Every structure is written in C-alpha cells, then in structure tokens.
C-alpha cells in the first residue's frame, strides 16, 4: 500500500530503516519519480525522503513543479544544513553563522526558507520541527 522514493545522497540508505517498498532516484529527481509512481498507482501512498542538498539545491525545480501541478505524494525533507555525504560543505540551507567545511566562519548571505515557500493550493500540510 505504501511506496517510497529515496534519491542518491544522505537518504540513499533509507530503505534499510523502513519496512516499505522503496526505489532509488537520481540526485534531486525523487519528486519526478514519485509523481510517475503515483500516477501509475493512484491507490498507493507515495512519499519521498530527501535531504536538503538533494531537495533544496539539486532538486529544487522538481519539487516546485510537482507542487505547482498538485502532485499527490508526501515529502519528508531532512534538513541537516550541509551536504553530508560529500564532506559537510555549505548547502542552501546552512544557517547564517553555522560552520561547515566550506564556510569555516559560518554560513553567510540571505537564506531562503523552503518551508515558508510551500504554500501552494495543493499543499495540505507543512511542518517545521
């Protein structure tokens, strides 16, 4: 009844921790894969499990367009503020002042908060913990 999509990156091993059917997607493309799965299997609950480097950077276009189309899947956005699999570099979600391997004095510049931009007519629920 439930199908998950985990892309390359921090979430690539998610299938080892969840007792659901999972598939992998190219980096940033989990929303596109989830859209296709949901359209082929409208009776299934489909979700993506994505890190911030994947979702808020490489796959930003995919999630924005999926929301604009009103695709019917759930996204779990795991935000650790860095690119975790490649050495901890600064990501689009790195907080101002948060240190990373490429921002030793802390993150800088304006930060776009993804959760605050998730207010499309198709969005049902958005929570930030």
Task: Name the predicted role of every residue range.
Residues 1, 59-62, 110, 114:
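General structural feature for long, well-ordered alpha-helical segments within catalytic domains
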Residues 8-84:
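Thiamine diphosphate
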Residues 2-7:
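A short beta-strand-loop structural module common to alpha/beta enzyme folds
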Residues 40-43, 91-129:
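Conserved thiamine diphosphate
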Residues 87-89:
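Short aromatic-enriched loop/helix-cap "lid" or pocket-rim segments at secondary-structure transitions
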């Amino acid at each position: 009844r439930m199908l998950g999509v985990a892309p390359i990156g921090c979430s690539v091993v998610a299938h080892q921790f969840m007792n659901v059917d999972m598939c992998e997607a190219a980096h940033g493309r989990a929303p596109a894969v989830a859209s296709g799965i949901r359209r082929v299997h409208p009776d299934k609950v489909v979700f993506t499990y994505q890190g911030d480097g994947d979702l808020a950077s490489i796959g930003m276009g995919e999630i924005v367009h999926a929301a604009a189309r009103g695709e019917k899947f759930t996204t779990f956005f795991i935000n650790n503020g860095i690119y975790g699999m490649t050495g901890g570099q600064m990501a689009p979600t790195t907080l101002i002042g948060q240190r990373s391997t490429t921002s030793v004095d802390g993150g800088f510049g304006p930060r776009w908060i993804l959760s605050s931009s998730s207010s499309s007519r198709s969005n049902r629920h958005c929570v930030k913990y």
